[in-house]
Amino acid sequence: MKISIKKKYRFLLALLLLLSILVVIISNFTIEVSARGKTFTDPANTPKNKVGLVLGTSRMLVKGGVNPYYANRIKATIELYKAGKIEFILVSGDNGTIYYNEPTTIKKDLIKGGIPDEKIFLDYAGFRTLDSMVRAKYIFGLDSVTVISQKFHNERAIYLAEKKGLKAIGFNAEGITGKQGVKVQFREYFARVKVFLDLLFNTQPRFYGDKIEIK
């Protein structure tokens, strides 16, 4: 019996869907396993590093109010610094327009939290996590770093960092539950697939630039 074109199409579509799901699962599992034992939630148990790398995000939500992901990263950074587990802070984020400047905004809030101005360095070209990790190594000359973000983000950042020759651990800012948290976690699955595409195609940061010494 001949298989109709419609049935062939459905079979190929189902196969493609299955393969896509497998890619997502494998990508997520690989990154999660790779980061085991490398992220921390208690400053007392967190190894010391010269530099803590804060990954930027928007301060305000689209619908108004402070972004809890942002607020929790600020809190975690201040906590880790005051515990003596980092000496300097590198803030890496998006500075794509004159109206949007993640690093400067974060720096202001860190200073309000008691961190000295001279201890904070800014990376204005951290448009993506990949950019932040590569630039930390090649622009700021770091061999090791403590990444500060939510756990799911730290895991991805650590995987990227190690693939780019940067030793990294993560200090986990508090996560978010509810609808907003679910939405972000869902997007994270696909962000992890993109990690492997970036590594496969050797994607480079948008900008490099002059070297900056953190001291």
What residue ranges belong to the model's regions?
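N-terminal type II signal-anchor transmembrane helix
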Residues: K2-P43
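Hydrophobic transmembrane signal anchors and adjacent membrane-proximal interface regions, especially
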Residues: M1-Y9, I78-L80, I86
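Extracytoplasmic electrostatic interaction patches
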Residues: A173-E174, R192, G209-K211
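A transmembrane-helix-recognition feature enriched in membrane-embedded lipid enzymes
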Residues: V182-Q204
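Structural motif marking the loop-to-transmembrane transition
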Residues: K2, K6-R10, G178, V182, ...
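A structural signal for short, hydrophobic/glycine-enriched beta-strand patches
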Residues: F29-Q185
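Enrichment for repetitive, rod-forming helical segments
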Residues: L17, L80, L199-F201
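Short linear elements at protein peripheries
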Residues: T203-K215
